[in-house]
Design a protein with these regions (language model features):
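Extended alpha-helical scaffold/tether regions of large eukaryotic proteins
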Residues: 1-263
Length: 263
């Protein structure tokens, strides 16, 4: 027991004063070397010290503030040095870290400017490594509480232009990136496209045709037909989604008085 106390004190000193949290290997090596030698309550102490060091570091350095100048590559990719420790930490220590990360994730989404493409990409890079760890229910709740209001507001402010390709529209790109990274559920993505984008598209086409009703053969009308055909072709590449939104897209075709079978 005396030797165990000396050893644990040395390990604690190393963890608190010498360990670089970005390097999980020494801690993993210590765990595998001593977990079968030291009594369980000493291992529990080590777990708490490791967890405490990680949380202290995150508190000081990891705020999800959207300024690239304030972040190092290590900070942006904290999953690279936290995930390897998940298998060796006790449930209590792990819970403390994950609760902290959950809070940071929520804070990051709260302060996220959804219309800023750089911030959006940074957010995706930060969140995507944690999707499997936190589970489907966590992300559903996040969607309802934070993502949904921001997304609806973003689409409400969307300005459509027949000269802008759909694949270049920020909110469309963002929705599919969030879906592909499993940050928002697939069903929510479909609902957003139908209820936010296609409804806006429908309204835009109605107004466009109303303004140009006496000039059907003008270049503007040709432009919108080409533009809309490209929109359909774009959604056809999203196979599962396309089947769900096909009828809604067809409603817009009727507005355009297009007889061609482009859908």
């Amino acid at each position: 027991m005396f030797i165990s106390k000396i050893l644990i004190n040395k390990l604690i000193f190393y963890i608190e004063n010498q360990w670089d949290v970005h390097n999980s290997k020494p801690i993993i090596n210590i765990y595998h070397l001593y977990s079968d030698i030291l009594p369980k309550h000493f291992i529990d102490i080590l777990n708490k010290k490791i967890s405490h060091c990680i949380i202290n570091y995150l508190n000081k350095n990891y705020h999800f503030i959207f300024s690239k100048n304030e972040k190092t590559e290590k900070d942006l990719k904290i999953h690279l040095w936290i995930h390897p420790l998940l298998d060796i930490l006790s449930l209590d220590s792990l819970a403390d870290i994950l609760r902290f990360i959950e809070q940071k994730i929520e804070n990051s989404i709260k302060t996220w400017n959804i219309n800023n493409s750089d911030e959006s990409q940074l957010l995706i890079n930060l969140l995507s490594p944690w999707t499997k760890l936190f589970g489907e229910e966590f992300w559903k709740n996040l969607y309802k509480k934070f993502f949904s209001p921001k997304i609806h507001e973003m689409f409400s402010e969307l300005y459509l232009d027949v000269h802008e390709k759909i694949e270049n529209i920020h909110c469309i790109k963002l929705i599919f990136e969030l879906k592909e990274n499993k940050i928002i559920p697939s069903k929510k993505c479909t609902k957003i496209i139908k209820n936010d984008f296609i409804e806006k598209l429908n309204f835009f086409i109605k107004n466009f045709m109303k303004k140009n009703k006496n000039n059907y053969n003008c270049d503007k009308n040709k432009d919108i037909i080409i533009w809309y055909s490209n929109i359909i072709n774009y959604f056809k590449t999203k196979k599962n989604l396309y089947e769900d939104i096909k009828n809604s897209l067809n409603d817009c075709l009727i507005l355009l008085n297009i007889n061609e079978n482009i859908i």
